[in-house]
Design a protein with these regions (language model features):
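Active-site-adjacent bridging/hinge elements
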Residues: 43-49, 97-98
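Short, contiguous, pocket-lining structural segments
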Residues: 39-43, 62-69, 86-92
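Acidic/histidine metal-binding catalytic segments
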Residues: 87-90, 133-145
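An active-site-proximal "capping" alpha-helix that borders the catalytic cofactor pocket
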Residues: 70-73, 115-132
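Active-site flanking loop/helix segments enriched in acidic
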Residues: 49-66, 75-78, 104-108
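His-Asp-centered metal-binding catalytic motifs of divalent-metal-dependent phosphohydrolases/nucleases
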Residues: 90-110, 117, 121, 125, ...
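N-terminal core-entry segment
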Residues: 72, 77-85, 94, 100, ...
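Divalent metal-dependent phosphate-bond-processing catalytic cores, especially two-metal-ion Mg2+/Mn2+ enzymes
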Residues: 1-34, 58-61, 68, 75-87, ...
Length: 241
């Protein structure tokens, strides 16, 4: 394995506890306005282009728009809060992670297996990306991040893109993190407005709550139960209140 791939594909070890990263603050560096034109999806990469087309077909529009918002939020977070990691991280690897992180929630995939959606989604993403020609290291990095994207906790470590996908998805879903104070302030208002303008949230939280309830009903053992209280405790993003 190439050592350079560790940084490029986001394998760098990070604390699992986001609170240990941010301390008592919602950010390390004060967020600044960032245009989405500065953090475009790298569709010049043929693997990203194929995955984008696949995601548009496989996912409901609500989930696809969520995945795109997560991409932009994560790019803003990595550039402004973790510039060292951002300088090495492949935007393509990050884009693939975002586009596929909820692939396990599609109507077909949710009922295709008894496995929890995040775990099956990681396996599915690995298969899809191998088929699209991703390197084994890139495909595995994406798969691990997807498998652990609901594994929010305070013990141990996680990959960099694993932590990043947690931060970006939690920000879009509820805007409140169980271990980070005032988490809704992590993204500049202007950046958030541009992202939401390009990929409107609509009734995303209501829609995804329905997906969660369906998985709980058919898979009472599912990993989603670990995060469900976080979702239900915040029905609206702080910025929308």
């Amino acid at each position: 394995m190439c050592q350079n791939e560790v940084e490029v594909n986001g394998w760098t070890s990070m604390p699992a506890n986001a609170g240990a990263i941010f301390g008592d603050n919602p950010f390390i560096n004060v967020p600044e306005a960032l245009s989405i034109d500065e953090i475009k999806l790298p569709i010049d990469d043929p693997i990203v282009e194929k995955t984008l087309s696949y995601a548009k077909t496989a996912l409901p529009v609500e989930t696809f728009n969520h995945s795109m918002r997560v991409y932009y939020y994560g790019m803003a977070i990595t550039k402004q809060q973790f510039p060292k990691q951002a300088s090495a991280l492949s935007p393509s690897t990050w884009a693939l992670t975002c586009l596929l992180h909820d692939i396990g929630t599609s109507e077909h995939n949710l009922t295709a297996t008894r496995m929890s959606f995040d775990i099956y989604g990681g396996i599915k993403a690995l298969d899809v990306l191998n088929g699209f020609g991703a390197t084994p290291d890139q495909a595995e990095a994406v798969a691990e991040a997807i498998i652990r994207h609901q594994d929010v906790g305070v013990h141990g470590t996680i990959t960099y893109i694993g932590q990043l996908i947690q931060l970006a998805t939690i920000y879009d879903n509820v805007g409140a993190h169980p271990y980070v104070n005032d988490f809704g302030n992590l993204i500049h208002d202007t950046t958030r407005a541009q992202v939401q303008g390009a990929h409107p949230p609509g009734e995303w939280r209501t829609f995804f709550s329905g997906v969660i309830q369906k998985e709980e009903a058919i898979k009472p053992w599912c990993h989603t139960k670990k995060m469900v209280n976080v979702m239900r405790n915040r029905s609206r993003h702080p910025a929308e209140q």
